[in-house]
Each structure stands twice: as C-alpha cells, then as structure tokens.
Amino acid sequence: MADAAAPDAASVRNFTINFGPQHPAAHGVLRLVLELDGEVVERVDPHIGLLHRGTEKLIEQKTYLQAIPYFDRLDYVAPMNQEHAFCLAVEKLLGIAVPRRAQLIRVLYAEIGRILSHLLNVTTQAMDVGALTPPLWGFEEREKLMMFYERASGSRMHAAYFRVGGVHQDLPPKLVDDIDAWCDAFPAVVNDLDRLLSDNRIFKQRNVDIGVVTLDQAWSWGFSGVMVRGSGAAWDLRKSQPYECYAELDFEVPIGKNGDCYDRYHIRMEEMRQSVRIMKQCIAKLRAPDGQGPVVVDDHKIFPPRRGEMKRSMEALIHHFKLYTEGFHVPAGEVYVAVEAPKGEFGVYLVSDGSNKPYKCKIRAPGFAHLQAMDFLSRGHLLADVSAILGSLDIVFGEVDR
C-alpha cells in the first residue's frame, strides 16, 4: 500500500523559480530563472538588460570630453577606473604623454576605486551568506574614500575627474596628507574583517568548494581579474602589461589555488592591502621633488587654458571656446586599451574617423563574461549557494547592461 502512494520518478517534475530582479542578493537588477530539482540547481538562465541605456551609441554622438562621464556610470562602485581606460585610449590615438604628476594621481585614485569595490564586495558577500556586521564596517571606510573622491572632483560618485592628457585639477597638499593618514589606519580594518570572516565556520561552509573554476575553464570562459587569479594564474595587467607608472611601483599579485568562492574572497582581501601599499608609494612620489609639476598636458588644443590666462589672452579665449563647442579632433585610427579594473580586465576599443566624436567605442566589461558563466558555475549546487556564487563574481549591472 505504501508503494502505491509513492510517486514514480517520471511524475516528479523540475520546477522553475525567479530570482530577482528585486532580490537583495541579486546585486542590482539581475533576474535569474532557476530550474530546480528539489533544492539542487539544474539550470540558471540570467536575464540581463534591465539597466541598458545604449551607452556605446550615446558616446558616438558626444565629443571626446563629453563621453567621459558615461564611463563613471558603468561600474558605478569604482568610477574612476573606467574613465582611466577611455582616457588612455584617446591619448594613445593622439600620441601624447601624460605628465608624471598626473600619472601618480590617476594611479592613486584607481587604487582608491579598487578598495571601494573590494570593500563593498567582500562585506556584501558576507551579508549574502548571513553575516550582518561586515557591511557596517565596510561602509564606514567607503564613506571616507568617497570624501576623498569629493575633495578631488566635487562629486562622491560620478567624478569625471580624469581628462585626456591628465586630470582636471591638482590635489591640495592637505588632501594628500589625509589620504596618507587613512592608509596608515586602514590595514587594521582589513585585519578586523579577516578575523571576523576568514576562520568563521559558517562563512567557510558557505564558500569553500563552492563555484569551483579550474584555470583552463577560466581562460575558456574569458574570465579576468580575481576570477582568473583565484584559479592560480598571476595575470594582472598592472604587472603583465604595465600602464601609467605601475612599472616603477612595488606590489604583489595574490593568487588562489582552489578557484572557489573562498579563494576569491581571500584574494580581494589581500588586494586591498596591496592597494594601500601602492597608494603609500604614490603619495611618497607626489611629495618628492620629481613628483611636482603640471597635472595635464600643456596643449591648449586638447585641454583648456587657465582662467587667468583667458582674461589676458584672446588666443586662450578662442581655444577655450573651440574646445567646449566643437571639441578636439582625434587622428583617424583604432586602438584597444585595457586596464586592471577591480572586477577584471576593463577594455575600450576606440575607433576614430578623424572627427571630434568617436566613430565607435566598444566597451569590454569584465562582469559580462563572468555573468554568462553563471549557469556553468551554479549547476549541481544547492539553491542557497547561488547567492554565494553570484557574490563572488562581483557583478555590477551598470557595466553588464551598459
């Protein structure tokens, strides 16, 4: 009689559920359609595009200067890193060299962006698996870093601080001193987070051996950044293809060996320490005699003259007017430039037709390649592991949907 009541295998169907787009663990407007066999994930289908604004098409209708703010709105957790890639691409086409002080300021703020991103990711990943204290600590430090953004550019998030040929304005000495003081205090916060999470039994159970990627699989899927380093490859564009002044800076590239969520967490923790190390070196070089000087190229066909000069010189006024009405013209050609953004390799493929607007600007967002592997990473795991895997990918939808 008991056997008759038991359902046969054919009548047990998989069921489909929606995860997001308003789920707090979805990290933005992600919708996952999950096919489950009981608690086990059979298939994951990410539905993207809910934050699509047509950024690449909009850039084609703007001058090179007007295009910069669009890059802040891609990975809006670490905005200046994206501006960096675009400015480097335009500079390569123009064939101009950025002054040394501007390079140091750019690298300093790129590393601040890296810490902003990793702090948010590590602490919200902990929240995804049930720890509520880390986000409170992380946001306290992020607030201080956003104040540094604001003091340099006037904006906490969408800075638009980098310019083709340098940065918009120099850093006041007091700001450099305050960043230096923050760098001295921050490692203690990372150590506190480390003590709270790294040996926590529940955190390890939720992350160890979850979302494992071998190195060959990582290359096949087009992974970059932490996703590749977690699988054992010391691939970091700051070391392997140095840009700006990274070649003269001393820092380590942390790598994992298991390729799971726990290794990726550890790499982000160590990268924050290395970023502080880079920032300290940049600050020392900014204070040194050879770190003084202009923060932008001295070419008024690319960067406008100073206000004082415009009050004295008609030629300077004409340069200013032409720059802000028409913009500068970039020689025809095409170039691909990639930077090591916090999420991975952020690339800009820029095509110029010799006019004052980009003919095409293709954006290579690292999060896009990582999210497309969500089905491969989650298959066979439990439903509860999906949010842990998603957290370890570090997805931001500004850059995925663009």
Swiss-Prot record:
EC number(s) recorded for this UniProt protein: 7.1.1.-
Subcellular location: Cell inner membrane
Main location: membrane
Broad EC category: translocase
Cystine crosslinks: none
Membrane topology: Peripheral membrane protein
Keywords: Cell inner membrane, Cell membrane, Membrane, NAD, Quinone, Translocase, Transport, Ubiquinone
SUPFAM superfamilies: HydB/Nqo4-like (SSF56762)
Substrates-to-products reaction catalysed: a quinone + NADH + 5 H(+)(in) = a quinol + NAD(+) + 4 H(+)(out)
Pfam (any one): Complex1_49kDa
Gene Ontology terms for molecular function: NAD binding; NADH:ubiquinone reductase (non-electrogenic) activity; quinone binding
Gene Ontology cellular-component terms listed: plasma membrane
Function description: NDH-1 shuttles electrons from NADH, via FMN and iron-sulfur (Fe-S) centers, to quinones in the respiratory chain. The immediate electron acceptor for the enzyme in this species is believed to be ubiquinone. Couples the redox reaction to proton translocation (for every two electrons transferred, four hydrogen ions are translocated across the cytoplasmic membrane), and thus conserves the redox energy in a proton gradient.
Protein family per UniProt: Belongs to the complex I 49 kDa subunit family.
Assembly and oligomerization: NDH-1 is composed of 14 different subunits. Subunits NuoB, C, D, E, F, and G constitute the peripheral sector of the complex.
HAMAP family xref list: NDH1_NuoD
This protein's name: NADH-quinone oxidoreductase subunit D
Species in which this protein is naturally found: Rhodopseudomonas palustris (strain TIE-1)
